[in-house]
C-alpha cells in the first residue's frame, strides 16, 4: 500500500514539474515568425519579428 501511495505521489509531482517547465520554456523561447513589412497588429511585438522590431503594432521594421 505504501509503495502505491509513493508511486502516485511521484507521478503527480513529475506531472506538475513537467507542466511548470513547459510553461516556463514557452515564455523563455522567442520564436520569430514575421518578416520585415509583415503586420504585427495581433502580436505584442516580443520576438515575433525575425529581423527587426514591431513598430507600434503596425508592421515589422528591420534594424538598420
Swiss-Prot record:
Keyword Signal part of the UniProt annotation: yes
Principal subcellular localization: secreted
GO MF, any single term: toxin activity
Signal peptide: 1-22
GO cellular component: extracellular region
Keywords: Disulfide bond, Knottin, Neurotoxin, Secreted, Signal, Toxin
UniProt keyword annotation of Ion transport present: no
Domain notes: The cysteine framework is VI/VII (C-C-CC-C-C).
Protein name from the UniProt record: Conotoxin Cal6.24
Species per Swiss-Prot/TrEMBL record: Californiconus californicus
Amino acid at each position: 500500500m505504501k509503495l502505491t501511495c509513493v508511486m502516485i505521489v511521484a507521478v503527480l509531482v513529475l506531472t506538475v514539474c513537467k507542466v511548470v517547465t513547459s510553461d516556463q520554456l514557452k515564455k523563455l523561447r522567442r520564436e520569430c515568425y514575421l518578416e520585415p513589412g509583415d503586420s504585427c497588429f495581433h502580436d505584442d511585438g516580443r520576438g515575433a519579428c525575425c529581423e527587426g522590431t514591431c513598430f507600434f503594432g503596425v508592421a515589422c521594421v528591420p534594424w538598420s
